Amino acid sequence: MSKNLFEECEKCLHDEPAASTAWCPVHVDVPLFASEMEKGDFKKAYQVLEKKIPFTGIIGMICDHPCEKACVRDKLDRAINVSELERAAVRYGYTPFKKGPSMPKKKGKVAVVGGGISGITAAFELDRKGFQVTIYEQSERLGGRVWDYEGKRISREAIEEELQIIERLGIKVSYDSRIGEEELEQLTEEYDAVYLGTGEWEKGLYIHPDTFQVFDSPLFAGGRLYDKSGSVIYAVSSGKRAALSMERYIKKISLTASREREGSFETSLNYQLGDVEPAPRIEKIHDVYTEDEAVREAKRCLKCRCSECVKTCSHMQKFNVTPKGYGRQIQINESVIMGTRYANKMINSCAMCGLCAEQCSLGIGMKDLIHETRESMVEKSKMPPSAHDFALKDMEFSNSNRFFMVKPPPGDKKAEYLFYPGCQLSASCPEYVEKAYRYLLSSVKEGVGIMLGCCGAPADWAGRKDLMRESIERFKNVWNETGKPAFILACSSCIGIFEKYLPEISYVSLWEIFQKYGLPETAKPEHRHILNIHDACGTRHKKEVHESVRKLASGLGYEIEELKYAKDKTKCCGYGGLVYYANREQAIDFAEDRIRESKADLLVYCAMCKDLFVSQGKRTFHILELIFGENPEDAARKKMPNLSQRHANRAGLKTRLLRELWGEEPEMELMERNELNLVIPQELWKTMEERYLLLEDIEQVVARSRISGERFFNPEDSSYLASLRIKNVTYWVRYAEKEGEIHVISAYSHRMEVVKE
């Protein structure tokens, strides 16, 4: 598998920090903090602060909030008032510091000169790392300029309570210790590392901007010695970062490795405001937000996170994954040699529609990775047979003699075009395929032949490279044998296959042909209602297809209202990627998600889109119903044929075309059916659909059992139970014979083979 595709997934921005978090020098998770505040859980909000900020009861009250300058909301109205939210979290969620289990002290002792904000932060961090710490403070109390805020933003009692943390940790403090140049030099000899946080120093110091080391020595410095702005939170940051450097220095490891994102930095996350409505900042009535005010202000936070692809994808929402997480789960799944591959169902539930790449600012998408993964699963014999078996058998049927056909125009005229309607349109609306071909014969003077069959999309989606190669070779052979005509395509999946695998063959959509040669006379324009167009995901980048369908609908008198996700941003109906067969529940989620977006009736130009939307109760028109339908309004609720009818419709289309246009009778294989008078209850038809059982499967089981006599008889109800293995599936049918009719009672299938002795 391609390493590059996994590397692309790793570039996913979903886990990138919000701009406010990135610009906060200690990287408080602002969205998480705001989320807890919004819920009114002030204790949890306080804990979020406490994870990044020591002496939270002090710093939370006096933080100078540089994060607000980076707040994305500031581009719309005003930044979130993080400063006041912090103060509210301290006021309503304050929890006294709890000393954790004491760590064994490491071989190493450090000194901290200056008991101000950066100094006590460095001491706190170094103690947590297990070092023996001594603070040298020139005055009689710790805190430094914290005391400047006494009575203004914080009480004396609150300051004293928080500063007791130093004593409770057992950190030594030497008060009234004035340290000058000479004393500092002695400390650097006595201790393994020394932190200088005095705010001022008589001699100029070169402090490394990343490590806070002073020259190449055991001395480190921060606070106002490094940042002249006097920022409280930057003082905290410098103390934390210097403590890490001191630990590395003592351990004799790199001071600079893996430190690119310490301190303030610009995130790669580019949060889109999109439809976000302005919301005025909540103003406080008293010195601190009330609980209600804090909750309302926290609600203004956008909780910035890149979820553009997830927001539009039912699949990623259902499995709770992002491209990065998806890629990692695939790697784990691929590495399993023995045991269960838990990601198989997820991998087979992706529609491979490509919307994720369109939504991503970096163009990261799952389509190609999922495709390669499925191919890999097939090659390693790890693809569950049940996932795509029916779809591949359906494709096999479409390319068998029962449907496949290539014919020149009647009268053996030369054809510059070859009409290829595809297998699904022929199964869902065979009458419109026939009408469309008759239209082409009468309107396109260059001559139009016809080819029936399946383009191979199911094989491509299923990761079956062998079957896909056969399909491509079939197309190339037909194209060469018929004089290299241009194909007229009526299926968006076919368009996708031609774009991907057959670049040498020119094609045009049926909708563009209608636009070029004009609509049939029966399609009379009249004033009609509003429609929302759902673009097929297979035509995502085919602007000419999008425009031609819209012009056709407008020409027929319909008013078009665009969906939010249209054209190159369209969503999948739920059939793409064979999701309909691998995970029916996921396919329905796709369909319902799209339906929720539409307020008017839908207009589609893909047969499966039509069938899936109607199956979920949405009035939906296929463009051919508007062009050829005698009563288009009735067609909006026309339900999809069942699986057995779809086979019959394809075979019937071929039969009619051969007889009516060429005066030919179909081959015997096409006409061969078991002469059985089967009676199947409606409820059983539904079960057969859910279990992918075809009428012809039932017929074969019953017919074979009656001929061979291999069946079980139940004297209680005079019913028979028979089985038959067809290829890789064993079918079971329970039936009863009554007055010349065969009443089918139940049917099911499995992949186990019944061995007869």
Predicted ranges, named:
Residues 145-146, 205-207, 515-522, 571-573, ...:
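Short, charged, surface-exposed secondary-structure boundary motifs
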Residues 1-102, 193-349:
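Ferredoxin-type iron-sulfur electron-transfer modules and their immediate structural context
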Residues 7-31, 55-76, 299-318, 348-363, ...:
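Local cysteine-cluster metal-coordination motifs and their immediate loop/turn environment
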Residues 637-645, 649, 654-757:
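Ribonuclease/tRNase effector modules and their secretory precursors
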Residues 34-192, 197, 320-503, 644-659:
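Iron-sulfur-cluster electron-transfer modules
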Residues 150-152, 424-509, 540-557, 561-657:
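Cofactor-cradling patches in redox/metallo enzymes
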Residues 519-555:
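C-terminal amphipathic alpha-helical segment
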Residues 111-113, 220, 418, 532, ...:
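Conserved beta-strand elements of the Class I
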